[in-house]
């Protein structure tokens, strides 16, 4: 269980950085790249400085790797992370995610998912087993894919105006309700979101029961 202190049930946002920047999906992916294997209290200040220095994908795509390394060196793995962030920005600038275009994500969300489909799939679909709109972007893995699905996918697909079904059609189920993340903070986040709806949720199985 995450040690993060989650907000009360009266709050509308969970407090993790993904819930703050979900309307800027490129930066959500950069943030999770920095957060991977790094405490949020260390990564967050550097993330905001990086975003201020390089305000859009094009500027980060053209950044000098050495400059990026210098900005993030206190987090460790600065060479690998800076290279990945720049490649991510270049790929995003060249081919940003599009509604109705999914790219293969091998072994996601479960082992062997995506092994028997093509690299690119045309057509919008609720089911994203083995393929996602961001599956072509380098440097992304299950943590980034889970974060994208929870906070960004419904908006890109045009089925809701936020990650919790704002202005969606009656009977709509938000994407986050179908995600089973491995990351402890994402699990705690979803546990909190389910509990706000009156459910105790098992992060390993996805099963739930009414909270007493």
Model-predicted segments: where are they?
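N-terminal polyanion-binding entry modules of DNA glycosylases/AP lyases
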Residues: 1-117, 197-212
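C-terminal accessory module of base-excision DNA glycosylases/AP lyases that mediates lesion recognition
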Residues: 1-23, 101-138, 142-212
């Amino acid at each position: 269980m995450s040690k993060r202190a989650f907000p009360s049930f009266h709050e509308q946002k969970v407090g993790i950085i993904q819930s703050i920047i979900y309307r800027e999906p490129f930066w959500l992916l950069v943030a999770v790249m920095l957060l991977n294997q790094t405490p949020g209290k260390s990564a967050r200040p550097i993330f905001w400085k990086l975003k201020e220095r390089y305000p859009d994908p094009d500027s980060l795509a053209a950044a000098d790797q050495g400059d990026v390394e210098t900005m993030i060196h206190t987090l460790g793995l600065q060479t690998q992370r800076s290279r990945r962030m720049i490649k991510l920005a270049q790929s995003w600038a060249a081919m940003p995610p599009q509604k109705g275009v999914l790219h293969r994500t091998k072994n996601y969300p479960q082992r062997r998912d995506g092994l028997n489909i093509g690299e690119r799939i045309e057509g919008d679909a609720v089911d994203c087993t083995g393929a996602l709109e961001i599956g072509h972007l380098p440097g992304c893995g299950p943590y980034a894919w889970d974060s994208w699905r929870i906070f960004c996918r419904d908006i890109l697909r045009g089925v809701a105006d936020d990650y919790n079904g704002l202005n969606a059609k009656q009977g709509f189920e938000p994407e986050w309700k179908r995600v089973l993340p491995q990351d402890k903070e994402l699990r705690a986040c979803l546990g909190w979101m389910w509990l706000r709806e009156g459910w105790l949720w098992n992060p390993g199985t996805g099963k739930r029961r009414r909270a007493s």
